[in-house]
């Protein structure tokens, strides 16, 4: 399949943001231009026995503002961030009238997927706190679930791809979306980058490589 690159124009019609310096595009941009710093003391878990006490943590995020309670139980935090940002972008771009479901694609970039549930579950098993693993465990750690949940909830049936290329995952998801459009595979593509790697396991892993 040949890409018709010459004279092709791709247009960004919507954006969404869930970040350490703001939830929502307006809040994020206003804080960005004002020089607000998102790095602060970690509050998600106890850091007493960890070598690192600070991180760029997303705070004041309420998933119920973006999805029903039942859906929050199906998603790890990285999926919730992506889903919330996706809903904002979709709404900004025109809602359900963006493209037909069959021609609506999704690309997601995530380096680690659900790394936090892996550490939490292993700790629970090792300490005897958990006698069995939740049936939601595997779906919560799979990187592609971020794209899948959006597609399921919105009824999109176009191409759905997940890119995992370390720190460039989000950028590569955008370039993959561009190629998807230029090749004619889709009329519109939701390009996402999402991560929630903040966990004791990840902190210890990075610290040991310092």
What is each of the regions a protein language model found here?
Residues 170:
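Short conserved active-site loop signatures built around small residues
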Residues 173:
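Active-site histidine-anchored catalytic micro-motif
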Residues 1-158, 179-182, 198, 204, ...:
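Conserved "HGTGT" condensation-loop signature of ketosynthase/thiolase-family condensing enzymes
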Residues 195:
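Catalytic metal-binding/acid-base residues of hydrolase active sites
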Residues 186-187:
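Short, high-confidence coil segments that cap the C-terminus of an alpha-helix
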Residues 159-165:
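Short loop-beta-helix segment that forms the pyridoxal 5′-phosphate
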Residues 176:
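Internal active-site segments that recognize and position negatively charged phosphoryl groups
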